[in-house]
Amino acid sequence: AKVSYFGSSFGAYITLLYLSQHPEKDGKAFLRSAAVNMHVIFENPTEAEAFAMAQQGHLIINYGTPLKLTQKFVEDLKEHDLFELYKPGASNVMMIHGSEDETIDYEKAIDFAEKFDITLITVEGGDHRLSSDGMPEAVVMTAMDFYLND
């Protein structure tokens, strides 16, 4: 049986890393607002963030729930740049991304999709969560169509 993957944001990043390390995996991966440039999100910390990292060895950010990010985690992200590490394999990958994503640069999603010949569905006006009226339903319908059809 083929495995189906669904990843959103950081989960999509992890899915792509996994598929890069296991190119023999045959399945379908649908990625919503994929954090394809995860390593750059923490490249330019604010003065307060840099101070916290230097003093405590970590910082707390709030993405709905508090997340503790260690210096090691930030370094690991830099070492796992998908633009360098991703290797297309047997899996069929599709991405969906909002054109107004405030967290993950939409242009980077385009660059990634073009570099690796991945289908990218653009949701015009969509934010990172693709949360405006009708967008969650559009994501579900697009994913279902992708998974159920060859």
Label each residue range with its predicted role:
Residues L17-Q21:
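Active-site signature of alpha/beta-hydrolase-fold catalytic machinery across serine-
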Residues K25-D111, K115-T122, D127-L130, G134-V140, ...:
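The alpha/beta-hydrolase serine catalytic core
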Residues G7-T15:
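Gly/Ala-rich beta-loop-alpha elbow adjacent to hydrolase catalytic centers
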Residues A1-K2:
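Conserved acidic catalytic loop of the alpha/beta-hydrolase fold
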